[in-house]
């Protein structure tokens, strides 16, 4: 007679009916309870016991195989709909609420990184999650986070673009994980601690790959940036929104260095990112008695957040409370759905799930 304990995967215990009632029997060789039913039961009952034990073994083996496949999978958990309904409380029609991890799984960030208009948006969102929201993700969402991050790194290694941006992202994530992993026993991360240590080693490997990357020059010989007129070069440099990009560009050639030091260029950059009040609080004069806009920019960047602008963003419909990418169709009953949609910055997206 098989008896299942608390662990449904166990083979059970061996019992035999005697004149005094049911008793367990201990195998003298192995020191454990076994189903040596050949001596106590009929052959039919013995075969039933073996069949029951084999079924338990098959179920346990299938579960172990499924767990192993889940731990090794590299794909994101996709959903057919590329939108999600954001609800913050229970109602008669809908119970529960939407979490950050659920939204992260449903909004198809894995495909969004392939779009140059959405790439910076997704990277900024990953950085914000790595800073403070990693513990609020579910186990599946944390796995998707690492899988998307791996695709981002592979894309940067292939395209050789946005290298510094991803370096900063990896450094932010590694610093956060160092703090979270030290909190042993507090259940701040989902999964085994050794798995997260392995992921940290993977992050270090990615950082080393980015540090060792060699920018390959294009094979064709045509018109280059330095061949353009100076006014056109300066016009293009005014489109750069990061001062560090201007400094790096000025290190390419002496002529570009002269353009990168243009006072008007740095003045427009300061006025783009910061308000007049912020600028007046951080005035810096040069040796000639003029405003040093370059030094002012980097000082302002350390004190205030810079302006963020993206080619494509997530948007929230105020009519039906559906979150989706711009241009993605969603079931909305409004007469003019486009007028009901508002764009969300990465920080607005995070704040949307703070209850």
Curated annotation (Swiss-Prot):
Bipartite nuclear localization signal (motif): residue ranges = 280-295
Keyword flag Cell wall biogenesis/degradation: no
- Keyword hit for Ribosomal protein: no
A GO cellular component term found in this entry reads:
nucleus
Ranges for domain F-box: 223-271
Q: What gene is this protein a product of? A: FBXO32
Record note on quaternary structure: Part of the SCF (SKP1-CUL1-F-box) E3 ubiquitin-protein ligase complex SCF(FBXO32) formed of CUL1, SKP1, RBX1 and FBXO32.
A GO BP entry is: response to denervation involved in regulation of muscle adaptation
Which key words are in the record?
Cytoplasm, Nucleus, Ubl conjugation pathway
Map motif Nuclear localization signal onto the chain: 62-67
UniProt-recorded name of the protein:
F-box only protein 32
Q: In which pathway does it act?
A: Protein modification; protein ubiquitination
- Domain of life, per the record? Eukaryota
Motif (Nuclear export signal) positions are 169-173
Q: Please report the organism this UniProt entry assigns to the protein.
A: Bos taurus
Question: What job does the chain carry out?
Answer: Substrate recognition component of a SCF (SKP1-CUL1-F-box protein) E3 ubiquitin-protein ligase complex which mediates the ubiquitination and subsequent proteasomal degradation of target proteins. Probably recognizes and binds to phosphorylated target proteins during skeletal muscle atrophy. Recognizes TERF1.
Q: Where in the cell is it found?
A: Cytoplasm; Nucleus
Q: Which CDD domains match?
A: F-box_FBXO32 (cd22103)
């Amino acid at each position: 007679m098989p008896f299942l304990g608390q662990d449904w995967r166990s083979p059970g215990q061996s019992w035999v009916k005697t004149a005094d009632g049911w008793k367990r029997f201990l195998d003298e060789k192995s020191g454990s309870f076994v189903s040596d039913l050949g001596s106590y039961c009929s052959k039919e009952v013995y075969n039933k016991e073996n069949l029951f034990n084999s079924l338990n073994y098959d179920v346990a083996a299938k579960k172990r195989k499924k767990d192993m496949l889940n731990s090794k999978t590299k794909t994101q958990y996709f959903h057919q709909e590329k939108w999600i309904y954001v609800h913050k409380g229970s109602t008669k029609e809908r119970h529960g609420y939407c979490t950050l991890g659920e939204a992260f799984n449903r909004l198809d960030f894995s495909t969004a990184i392939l779009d140059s208009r959405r790439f910076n948006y997704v990277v900024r969102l990953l950085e914000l999650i790595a800073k403070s929201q990693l513990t609020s993700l579910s186990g599946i969402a944390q796995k998707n986070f690492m899988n998307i991050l791996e695709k981002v790194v592979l894309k940067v290694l292939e395209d050789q673009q946005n290298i510094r941006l991803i370096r900063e992202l990896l450094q932010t994530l590694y610093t956060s994980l160092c703090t979270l992993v030290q909190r042993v026993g507090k259940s701040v991360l989902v999964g085994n601690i050794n798995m997260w240590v392995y992921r940290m080693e993977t992050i270090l490997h990615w950082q080393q790959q980015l540090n060792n990357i060699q920018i390959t020059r294009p094979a064709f010989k045509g018109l280059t940036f330095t061949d353009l007129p100076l006014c056109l070069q300066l016009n293009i440099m005014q489109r750069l929104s990061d001062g560090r990009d201007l400094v790096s560009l000025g290190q390419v050639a002496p002529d570009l260095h002269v353009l990168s030091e243009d006072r008007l260029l740095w003045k427009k950059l300061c006025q783009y990112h910061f308000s007049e009040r912020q600028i007046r609080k951080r005035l810096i004069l040069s040796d000639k008695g003029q405003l040093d806009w370059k030094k002012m920019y980097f000082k302002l960047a350390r004190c205030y957040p810079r302006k963020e602008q993206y080619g494509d963003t997530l948007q929230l419909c105020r009519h039906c409370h559906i979150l989706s990418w711009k241009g993605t169709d969603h079931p909305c009953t409004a007469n003019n759905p486009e007028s009901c949609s508002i764009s969300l910055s990465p920080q607005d997206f995070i704040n949307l799930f703070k209850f």
